[in-house]
């Protein structure tokens, strides 16, 4: 998955951001499920990357609410 930057997120519509957030949360759930079943993630840094992207999306959402 492509790393999202704040500038790219701000250019998205609200619906696009919501859909991206939903997809990222599903990806995070999938990665955590793989690890919990005893498997190892193909890329260990992927969980961290997904969490940071979710945080960026939520930060931009909160900035726009103000």
UniProtKB/Swiss-Prot annotation:
Family annotation (CDD domains): Ribosomal_L29_HIP (cd00427)
One GO cellular component term: ribonucleoprotein complex
InterPro entries in UniProt: Ribosomal_uL29, Ribosomal_uL29_CS, Ribosomal_uL29_sf
Keyword terms of this UniProt record: Ribonucleoprotein, Ribosomal protein
GO biological process, one term: translation
Family annotation (Pfam families): Ribosomal_L29
Alphabetized GO MF terms: structural constituent of ribosome
UniProt xrefs under HAMAP family: Ribosomal_uL29
Family classification: Belongs to the universal ribosomal protein uL29 family.
Protein name: Large ribosomal subunit protein uL29
Taxonomic placement: Archaea, Methanobacteriati, Thermoplasmatota, Thermoplasmata, Thermoplasmatales
